[in-house]
Swiss-Prot record:
Pathway: Amino-acid biosynthesis; L-methionine biosynthesis via salvage pathway; L-methionine from S-methyl-5-thio-alpha-D-ribose 1-phosphate: step 2/6
Cofactor: Zn(2+)
Protein name, UniProt field: Methylthioribulose-1-phosphate dehydratase
GO cellular component, one term: cytoplasm
Protein family per UniProt: Belongs to the aldolase class II family. MtnB subfamily.
UniProt-listed GO biological process terms: L-methionine salvage from methylthioadenosine; monosaccharide metabolic process
Cofactor binding note from Swiss-Prot or TrEMBL: Binds 1 zinc ion per subunit.
Known catalytic reactions: 5-(methylsulfanyl)-D-ribulose 1-phosphate = 5-methylsulfanyl-2,3-dioxopentyl phosphate + H2O
Entry-linked InterPro entries: Aldolase_II/adducin_N, Aldolase_II/adducin_N_sf, MethylthioRu-1-P_deHdtase_MtnB
Length: 205
């Protein structure tokens, strides 16, 4: 294992412990990745507890989502990670989480997007410099056919190059960043904002 791969793998392991500890990636849910180079990514293998990841629980894939390590099975949602690396060369890490807030809010919001507006913490997202604008978070219906789901995500990405993340209804959040620390920051910001939105909804009933 070269130094770069070892460092990125450790970042994935550390992310898993942090996200599990916050209750945002329970049990074997969720998946995480980091860009290894222009043609490859490192991803968590299928079915592993994210708070207990080890070095053997991360594998390399190509950007088509194919495992480059015989005997290791990538997550079923690998294509949703590699799609992002192919879409934007600046993305260095992708995190998919299954928090209660993301899961419930995605079911409550009517329509195909959540609009975040006038929150100071919107500035935690890459490229956002003021609370005064809107951050649109698309919500895609869950689909066990990942290639079909990816085909629905792609047009949104192309039309919204500064999109910081998206939700899958009743499922969870995808967000990303140039580095793992950036992706983790965005998860934390999303979780705060999702909780705010849920409280607003509950108080307005």
């Amino acid at each position: 294992m070269n130094d770069n791969r070892e460092q990125l793998t450790q970042q994935i392991i550390d992310a898993g412990r942090f996200l599990y500890g916050r209750g945002w990636s329970p049990a074997t849910s969720s998946n995480y990745s980091a860009r290894l180079d222009e043609q490859r990514a490192l991803l968590t293998v299928s079915g592993k507890h994210k708070g207990q990841l080890g070095f053997d629980d991360v594998l390399a894939t190509d950007l088509a989502g194919n495992s480059l390590e015989p005997g290791k099975k990538p997550s079923a949602e690998t294509l949703l990670h590699t799609q992002l690396y192919a879409w934007n060369p600046a993305i260095g890490a992708v995190l998919h989480t299954h928090s209660v807030n993301a899961t419930v809010l995605s079911r409550l919001v009517r329509g195909d997007r959540l609009v975040l507006q006038d929150y100071e913490l919107q500035k935690a997202f890459a490229g956002v410099t003021t609370h005064e604008g809107q951050v649109e978070v698309p919500i895609f219906d869950n689909d066990q056919d990942i290639a079909r789901l990816a085909s629905r995500v792609q047009p949104w990405l192309e039309a919204h190059p500064h999109c910081p993340g998206y939700l899958i209804r009743g499922h969870g959040l995808y967000t990303w960043g140039a580095r793992m620390s950036d992706a983790l920051r965005q998860v934390e910001a999303f979780e705060f904002l999702f909780e705010c939105e849920l409280k607003v909804l509950s108080l307005s009933r």
